[in-house]
Structures are given as structure tokens and as C-alpha cells.
């Protein structure tokens, strides 16, 4: 085979043309110390705050401390194979997690990797875990209700879409139970849910997932797990990862609900990281920016207006507002709400549901303290029928608690006080509700109407729950159309009032319980 001289010269010219003289510079450093998941790196000149740092063995870290002659980074995952002298490289990327519909029904870790054994997740989109919250102009006021299905909350402490409502109480007071009931109640409403478990036992997380599957709620839920056995770094970033997954739905004109269970453990993890990074400790040994830790997370829960949704979707979605509702959970020690983290989160959120150990142990569940619980913006979003019927319930309960304490010392009470105490006892009994049995708007309306109109006054306190159960069964079978109309419109008018009066009178005349 003979080669033509012109062919050879053409070939050489092609090769020369394709030759790339570009120089790629990459910042590299050396690990100088490695203790408790904290890496000190010397020589990383161009690293950003929060940037991903690459270590040998496909391991990554996150740069948190940028100092004059070294960088302090936290390793995400196991670090047993790393040692002093290893190379660390800048990636130029901020930590991202997969987002989108593909994650629904799955259990993932804080980095978005599946841990439920159901195969890989085919996620097309990724989102940075840290984002700036929507500005004032992008937001819209809270005006749509988010029904939790719990009488005590929807009637007295209503939650709106886009609100941040804190659930606070000691351990074993039913905080997680309220959040799980709220997730179960979103079935069929189109609201997507994200449950972020931080520092929980793996058995507890598995139990939550099983309950969600049993009640058909896993189809619209993503579970993000950073259990107690995970590193402090993963417990610290898990809530931000969950928030990024929720923002995907909000920014496309949908509604999402995120539960952080719980932010106390995230604050502990952040304190641990900060102390290992040798940041100066402050009150209760927390670092100075622990308020910012929670405020930048919770401010991302919001309701954004249609113009912002249209801008974010580049015109694909028009005329729809999006919302991300947050239910952060905080665990108190012996009911002390004046501790550092509880006061911080109370001041950031739009209200709190305060759960008491004494009420829980007395069998009043959910153990909501009506006097200390408040919803600062949810009233504007409350369903009309519940707002009308539940208005006096909160006052009745708060006054009853006050009088009940006083009545222990007084032997003879006047008629008005005695009536108020008796009414309070019945309302307290009525507010009790079993776990995993959320109620519809119409069912709540029936129970509240019966209490308001005095239909419980001649019922023994111990029989109130039986009366309510029997009444609900009767309404379901005999007055299905009335219930359907209340659920459909959420309105309260003379026709509905007359219908409820007639139905309850007929029930009391013909039924025993």
C-alpha cells in the first residue's frame, strides 16, 4: 500500500488542527489532619463556602471553614479509607440532590440516594440544597387551608398552605403522630409530602414508612432519612435536601408539605460539627449562627404567586400559585420552651402547636394545649364552616382549664361556673381523636355543630366519644348528600344549619349509644 505525499500532509494538518493547547487548572490540596469526620486541607486556594471537595475513593466533603492557611471540610459518608497526605480537589459545584416526581414513594438518604432496596431512581433534574428564599414581591399571602384531619388543630390552630407551623413538646407527647396524620390526610388532595427524619432510630423510620404504606400515603410522599447512626454532616444537610425536593413542586405551581422531624437533632449535629471545626461556642455551646441555620431553612417554605411560577417554569405553567408548607418539630426538655433552640424556632415560624406531657398522660390525645398554641396566619385560610363552628371551642377549652384548676379548691360553685366546667369536659372529650384516623371537613363540622348547639349537654362525659362515633356512622349512611355538599363547598349557611339540626335531632330520638 502506497501513501500519497499530499494525503500524509493533509493527515498531519488535520491532527495539528485538532490538537488542543488549552490548559485546565484545578485547585488541589493535601489533607493535613482527619478527626471525627472533620478534614483540614492545606493548599486549596480557590474553594467556595459550601463547595463539594473530592477525596480519593469517590468520597466527597463540604467546605465549611475557610481560613488563612487551611480549609476545614466535613466528610459526607464514611472516611475510614482516607488518611493524612491524601489529595483533595475542588469540584466547583455546590452540593445538589435529585428532585422530581421520580422520588415519590421512595426512601432516600440525605444525598438523595435510594435506601429502600427498590432500585435506582431515574431523576432527570438536580437542585442545590441551599437556595435563597423567595423575596417579598414573589410571595402571596396564605389563603388556602391545609387540612390536617385533626379536629383539635383544624378548628383551633388552623394551618394554611405556605405557612410554617411549629409542633413543639417533650419526648413521647405525640409530635410525630400529628405530622404523620397530616401526611395521611393529604391523600387525594394533590399535595405532595416530604418527611425528613433527622437523628431518629432506624426502627422508628421503618415504622413510619410502613404506616404510610398501609394508609396509601406513600404514593404522594418522599421520605428523607438521616438516622441516628449517620454522621453529623448528613443529619445537618438532610432538612436542606428535603426542602430542595419540596421546592421543585412549589416552583411548578403545585402544593407541597414538608415535615422536619426534628430540628433539635439537626441543631445538635450542627453544634457537634461547629465545635469540631473549633468555632467559638455561645449559649448552650451552640455556635453563633444557629439561628441562621433554621431561619434560612424555614424561610424557604412559602406561597409564591402566579407570576413567579410562570417565570420559574419559563411560561409552561400559567395562572397557578405554588406553596411549600412546613411543619418543623422541636423537642423540649421538661416543657422548657425558653431554651435557646425552641425560642429561635418559635420566633421564626407562623405559630406553634404546643403538646403537653400531662395532657398526653391523662389520655387527651392529641395533647394540644389550647392556651399556649397559636396560628398567626392560618385563620385567613380556614374553611368557612370550620371557622364558624370552631370559633368558640378554643375559648371554651382555655376557660375550662383555668376553672378546672380553681374548682379543685372550691367546694360550692355557682351555676354558671359549673355549666362552663361541664361544657369544657365534654368539649375536651370531643377533641380526642385516634391516631391514623383523620376526619373530613364535613365530619368535623358535624362534631363541632353538636357541641356548639348543646346536643352533648345531656350526654354523660364518658359516653361523648361513643355518641360521636355513632352520630358519624348515622350521618354517613343517612345524610351522605349533606356531608358531600359541606365537603364540596366548605360553606355554612341556613340550609346546612337546618339540615344538621334535623339530622342530629332524628339521631338522638331514634338511636342509643
UniProtKB/Swiss-Prot annotation:
Q: State where the protein is found.
A: Cell inner membrane
Instruction: Summarize the protein's role.
Output: Produces ATP from ADP in the presence of a proton gradient across the membrane. The alpha chain is a regulatory subunit.
The protein's assembly and partners = F-type ATPases have 2 components, CF(1) - the catalytic core - and CF(0) - the membrane proton channel. CF(1) has five subunits: alpha(3), beta(3), gamma(1), delta(1), epsilon(1). CF(0) has three main subunits: a(1), b(2) and c(9-12). The alpha and beta chains form an alternating ring which encloses part of the gamma chain. CF(1) is attached to CF(0) by a central stalk formed by the gamma and epsilon chains, while a peripheral stalk is formed by the delta and b chains.
Task: Enumerate the InterPro entries for this protein.
Answer: ATP_synth_asu-like_sf, ATP_synth_asu_C, ATP_synth_asu_C_sf, ATP_synth_F1_a_nt-bd_dom, ATP_synth_F1_asu, ATPase_a/bsu_AS, ATPase_F1/V1/A1_a/bsu_N, ATPase_F1/V1/A1_a/bsu_N_sf
Q: Topology with regard to the membrane? A: Peripheral membrane protein
> Cellular component GO terms, alphabetically?
plasma membrane; proton-transporting ATP synthase complex
The entry marks the following residues as binding ATP, namely 169-176
UniProt KW keywords: ATP synthesis, ATP-binding, Cell inner membrane, Cell membrane, CF(1), Hydrogen ion transport, Ion transport, Membrane, Nucleotide-binding, Translocase, Transport
Q: Which domain of life is it from?
A: Bacteria
Q: Which reaction does it catalyse?
A: ATP + H2O + 4 H(+)(in) = ADP + phosphate + 5 H(+)(out)
- Source taxonomy: Bacteria, Pseudomonadati, Pseudomonadota, Gammaproteobacteria, Methylococcales
The EC designation for this entry is: 7.1.2.2
Q: Name one GO molecular function term.
A: ATP binding
Q: Which SUPFAM superfamilies match?
A: C-terminal domain of alpha and beta subunits of F1 ATP synthase, N-terminal domain of alpha and beta subunits of F1 ATP synthase, P-loop containing nucleoside triphosphate hydrolases
Q: What is this protein called?
A: ATP synthase subunit alpha 1
Amino acid at each position: 500500500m502506497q501513501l500519497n505525499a499530499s494525503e500524509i500532509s493533509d493527515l498531519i494538518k488535520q491532527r495539528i488542527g485538532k490538537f488542543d493547547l488549552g490548559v485546565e487548572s484545578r485547585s488541589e490540596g493535601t489533607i493535613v489532619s482527619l478527626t471525627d469526620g472533620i478534614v483540614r486541607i492545606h493548599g486549596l486556594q480557590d474553594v467556595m463556602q459550601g463547595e463539594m471537595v473530592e477525596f480519593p475513593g469517590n468520597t466527597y466533603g463540604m467546605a465549611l471553614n475557610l481560613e488563612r492557611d487551611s480549609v476545614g471540610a466535613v466528610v459526607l459518608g464514611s472516611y475510614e479509607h482516607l488518611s493524612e497526605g491524601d489529595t483533595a480537589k475542588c469540584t466547583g459545584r455546590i452540593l445538589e440532590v435529585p428532585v422530581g416526581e421520580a422520588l415519590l414513594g421512595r426512601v432516600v438518604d440525605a444525598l438523595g440516594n435510594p435506601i429502600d432496596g427498590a432500585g435506582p431512581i431515574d431523576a432527570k433534574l438536580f437542585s442545590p440544597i441551599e437556595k435563597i428564599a423567595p423575596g417579598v414581591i414573589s410571595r402571596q399571602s396564605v389563603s388556602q387551608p391545609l387540612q390536617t384531619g385533626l379536629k383539635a388543630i383544624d378548628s383551633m390552630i388552623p394551618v394554611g398552605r405556605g405557612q410554617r407551623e411549629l409542633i413543639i413538646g417533650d419526648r413521647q407527647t405525640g409530635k410525630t403522630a400529628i405530622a404523620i396524620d397530616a401526611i395521611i390526610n393529604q391523600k387525594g388532595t394533590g399535595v405532595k409530602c416530604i418527611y425528613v427524619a433527622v437523628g431518629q432510630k432506624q426502627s422508628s423510620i421503618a415504622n413510619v414508612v410502613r404506616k404510610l404504606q398501609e394508609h396509601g400515603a406513600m404514593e404522594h410522599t418522599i421520605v428523607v432519612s438521616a438516622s441516628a447512626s449517620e454522621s453529623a454532616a448528613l443529619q445537618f444537610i438532610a432538612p436542606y435536601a428535603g426542602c430542595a425536593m419540596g421546592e421543585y413542586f412549589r416552583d411548578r405551581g403545585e402544593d407541597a408539605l414538608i415535615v422536619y422531624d426534628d430540628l433539635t437533632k439537626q441543631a445538635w449535629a450542627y453544634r457537634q460539627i461547629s465545635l469540631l471545626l473549633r468555632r467559638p461556642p455561645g449559649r448552650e455551646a451552640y455556635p453563633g449562627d444557629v439561628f441562621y441555620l433554621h431561619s434560612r431553612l424555614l424561610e424557604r417554605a412559602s406561597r409564591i404567586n402566579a407570576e413567579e411560577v410562570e417565570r420559574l417554569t419559563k411560561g409552561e405553567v400559567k395562572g397557578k400559585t405554588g406553596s411549600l408548607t412546613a411543619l418543623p418539630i422541636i423537642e423540649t426538655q421538661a416543657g422548657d420552651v425558653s431554651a435557646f433552640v425552641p425560642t429561635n424556632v418559635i420566633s421564626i415560624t407562623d405559630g406553634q402547636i404546643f403538646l403537653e406531657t400531662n395532657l398526653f398522660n391523662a389520655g387527651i390525645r392529641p395533647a394540644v394545649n389550647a392556651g399556649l398554641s397559636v396560628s398567626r396566619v392560618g385563620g385567613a385560610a380556614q374553611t368557612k364552616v370550620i371557622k364558624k363552628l370552631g370559633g368558640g371551642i378554643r375559648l371554651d377549652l382555655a376557660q375550662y382549664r383555668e376553672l378546672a384548676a380553681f374548682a379543685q379548691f372550691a367546694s360550692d360553685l355557682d351555676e354558671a361556673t359549673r355549666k362552663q366546667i361541664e361544657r369544657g369536659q365534654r368539649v375536651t372529650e370531643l377533641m380526642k381523636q385516634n391516631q391514623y384516623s383523620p376526619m373530613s371537613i364535613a365530619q368535623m363540622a358535624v362534631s363541632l355543630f353538636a357541641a356548639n348547639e348543646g346536643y352533648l349537654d345531656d350526654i354523660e362525659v364518658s359516653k361523648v366519644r361513643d355518641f360521636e362515633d355513632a352520630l358519624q356512622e348515622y350521618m354517613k349512611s343517612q345524610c351522605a348528600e349533606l356531608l358531600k355538599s359541606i365537603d364540596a363547598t366548605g360553606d355554612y349557611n341556613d340550609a346546612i344549619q337546618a339540615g344538621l339540626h334535623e339530622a342530629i335531632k332524628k339521631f338522638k330520638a331514634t338511636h342509643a349509644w
